[in-house]
Every structure is written in structure tokens, then in C-alpha cells.
């Protein structure tokens, strides 16, 4: 799976991993031990209301994550407003990191199950997201990259709330977020970085967990987000229906 799409593309996603790793003040770091389900320590009940937030509270605001809006992708003015907000949230240095044109190279299209699987395998074959610390900034860079290179409307990247493993709400996206333990040595080595990833991702997460991307091929046929958090998916779909009715 993903072979045909790999033959069609040769370069664009090959640099994505390096662009994410070069995000300002952020390096790969070293992880301690194996990633386990819900293995890292939590700061407690921060963000308990994450899964129950209202439709109005699901705007993609700077400094927030896992709250990509559910909306009608056919509304052109809303797409443009969303794209402008995304661009406003990314500074000039991010533009250099993304390294793509301002306008998408192909017509805009919504993420589909098949497209999500193809993109997941393509990114994996080109170096992947495996083990890269998650942060709100890298979330936006990935959104922008796929929008500009593949024309994918950036309303698809959303994950279940914590604590523990965060499963993608887009069925077919094979990259989940897993809590990891960061070694003391890694923290010592990167202390001189103003915003090293183990610190930034921790504060991006309302549960205070350090998260990293992990490829999981079983997500192609098991909709874990819905199986484990049906109320979150239903709330998101309700917001989507509301926006369709208002539009």
C-alpha cells in the first residue's frame, strides 16, 4: 500500500522530516525506554474539558492543538479565512521551514480515507514522523505542507483528548501520538535551547505529557478514535452539521 503514490512523487515529502526537526529551537532528542500505552506521568486533570468543548471553542487558535475545526470544506470564504489564520500563526521562519509556495500547487481537496492512507505510507517511506516530538507548531507545519504540496484542506488533523495515546480522528491517518519519557541526559544536553521539543510539547498538551508521532498500520482497519471516544467523534460531527446548516 502506498507504492503507487510513492512512484508518482519523488522529492516533496522527503524533506518534511528535516523541516519538522529544524523547527526553531527544537531537536530530535533521545527517548528513554520503550513507548508504552499511557506510560508517562500526567500533571493531573488539566484540560478535562477538552472533549466537551463547544463548537464555538473549536477554532484553530495559536498555542492550542488537537482542535482543528470541523466545518464544511466547500465554503470557499471559510477556507480562505482558515488559511489566513494559519498563515498568521506561522512566522517568517516557519515559511522557510515549510519551503513551499504560498498557493497550493494542486486544486484544494478534502482528506479522504484512501488519501489519508496513501499520505501516511508516503510520509513513512520518506523518513516519516516516527519519534518526532509533537508540538502545536509542528502540527501547523504538517498542515501547511500537505495543503501546499497536495492541496489537502487543513481540517483533517485532529486527535482524541488525553491522557495517554491520542488517536487520529481522521480514519485512515496512520500516525498516532504516544506519551514518551524523556531521559535526564537529553534534557541536560538540550537545556541551552530556549524551546527544546520536550519542553514545548509538554506545555502544548493540557495533560502535561510529552508526545511523539508513531506509525500504526492497524489504524487502517480499526477506527480506534471512534471505538474508544465515541462521544468526541459525535460532538465533532454535531459541530460539522451545525456549520453546514448555518452555511
Swiss-Prot record:
Pfam families on file: F-protein
InterPro entries for the chain: HIV-1_Nef_core_sf, HIV_Nef
This protein's record includes keyword Lipid biosynthesis: no
Membrane topology according to the record: Lipid-anchor
Residue segments, region Acidic: 88-96
Assigned keywords, A-Z: Host cell membrane, Host membrane, Host-virus interaction, Lipoprotein, Membrane, Myristate, Viral immunoevasion, Virulence
Lipidation (N-myristoyl glycine): 2
Gene3D superfamilies: Nef Regulatory Factor
Main location: host cell
Gene Ontology CC entries for this record: host cell plasma membrane; membrane
GO molecular-function terms, A-Z: GTP binding
Annotated stretches, region: Disordered: 31-54
Family classification: Belongs to the lentivirus primate group Nef protein family.
Entry remark concerning the domains of this protein: The N-terminal domain is composed of the N-myristoyl glycine and of a cluster of positively charged amino acids. It is required for inner plasma membrane targeting of Nef.
Note: This is a macaque isolate.
Protein task: Seems to play a role in optimizing the host cell environment for viral replication without causing cell death by apoptosis. Enhances virus infectivity and pathogenicity. Probably involved in viral immune evasion mechanisms.
Subunit structure: Homodimer. Interacts with host CD247/TCRZ; this interaction induces down-regulation of cell surface TCR/CD3 complexes.
Protein name: Protein Nef
Gene: nef
Amino acid at each position: 500500500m502506498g507504492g503507487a503514490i510513492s512512484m508518482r512523487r519523488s522529492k516533496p515529502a522527503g524533506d518534511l522530516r528535516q523541516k519538522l526537526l529544524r523547527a526553531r529551537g527544537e531537536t530530535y532528542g533521545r527517548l528513554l525506554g520503550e513507548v508504552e500505552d499511557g506510560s508517562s506521568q500526567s500533571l493531573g486533570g488539566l484540560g478535562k474539558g477538552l472533549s466537551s468543548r463547544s463548537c464555538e471553542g473549536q477554532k484553530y487558535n495559536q498555542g492550542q492543538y488537537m482542535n482543528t475545526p470541523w466545518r464544511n470544506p466547500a465554503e470557499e470564504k471559510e477556507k480562505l479565512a482558515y488559511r489566513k489564520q494559519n498563515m498568521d500563526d506561522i512566522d517568517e521562519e516557519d515559511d522557510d521551514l515549510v519551503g513551499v509556495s504560498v498557493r497550493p500547487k494542486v486544486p484544494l481537496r478534502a482528506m479522504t480515507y484512501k488519501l489519508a492512507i496513501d499520505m501516511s505510507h508516503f510520509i513513512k517511506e520518506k523518513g516519516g514522523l516516527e519519534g518526532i516530538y509533537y508540538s502545536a507548531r509542528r502540527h501547523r507545519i504538517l498542515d501547511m505542507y500537505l495543503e501546499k504540496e497536495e492541496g489537502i484542506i487543513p481540517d483533517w488533523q485532529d486527535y482524541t483528548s488525553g491522557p495517554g495515546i491520542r488517536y487520529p480522528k481522521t480514519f485512515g491517518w496512520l500516525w498516532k501520538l504516544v506519551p514518551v519519557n524523556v531521559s535526564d541526559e537529553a534534557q541536560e544536553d538540550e537545556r541551552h535551547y530556549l524551546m527544546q521539543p520536550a519542553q514545548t510539547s509538554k506545555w502544548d498538551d493540557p495533560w502535561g505529557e510529552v508526545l511523539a508521532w508513531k506509525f500504526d498500520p492497524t489504524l487502517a482497519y480499526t477506527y480506534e478514535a471512534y471505538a474508544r471516544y465515541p462521544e468526541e467523534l459525535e460532538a465533532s460531527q454535531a459541530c460539522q452539521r451545525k456549520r453546514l446548516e448555518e452555511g
